[in-house]
Amino acid sequence: MEYALTADHHRVHAFDAEKGQEYYCPVCGNQVIPRQGEVNSWHFAHVTSCMDDWKYDMSEWHRGWQSRFPENVREIVVEHRGECHRADILMGGYVIEFQHSPISAGEFERRNKFYTRAGYKVIWVFDESYAFGNEYISSSLDDENKFVWKWPNRVLASVVPQRSTDIAVVLQLTEDHDDDGCEWLVKVEW
């Protein structure tokens, strides 16, 4: 995690953490320590395990997406009926989750249920640039605004089509930018 709390509940970024100070997990309240090495990105790590059983491994792709949003909406704790989890982005009734690493269909569904029951709409951004780059995803011959997925992501292939307005799935298909500097994102519709 990039953010922790001080003893007086101020949010601190790992870059601003000082050695010897005490910091706490915003989800479980357990003590965390700053990891400020030269190999991995600076972050906080639990001294003992966290009660939050969701995995939060963050790649550079993930961090890059989070850094495009204001700090005050990143890694925000969502609490619902005694259960707490950390949203990548929480902004105006929306949770945005960035997914670079594999996630099971069960975990995908579990997270969606938690956030929607807590009253939020969920937007997932999946990194599928490898699939597009390897031509596993290609433009449809019938409609250039649609794509054909030769070997779809197992999680997305197993998900029942979303008929809800509470959940949206977006794919990043390439790291190229258009003339406006925007990433090439495509909303998934079943």
Task: Show which residues each predicted segment covers.
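Anion (oxyanion) recognition and catalysis
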Residues: 116
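Cysteine-rich micro-motifs
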Residues: 22, 26, 39-52
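Short phosphate-binding/catalytic loops that engage adenosine nucleotides
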Residues: 119-120
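Short gly/ser-rich anion-binding loops that grip negatively charged ligand groups
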Residues: 51-55, 98
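Active-site metal-binding core of divalent-cation-utilizing nuclease and nuclease-like domains
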Residues: 12-17, 24, 29-34, 60-110, ...
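Non-catalytic C-terminal interaction segments of nucleic acid-processing enzymes
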Residues: 1-24, 132-190
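Short cysteine/histidine-rich zinc-coordinating motifs and their immediately flanking basic loops
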Residues: 36-43, 58-62
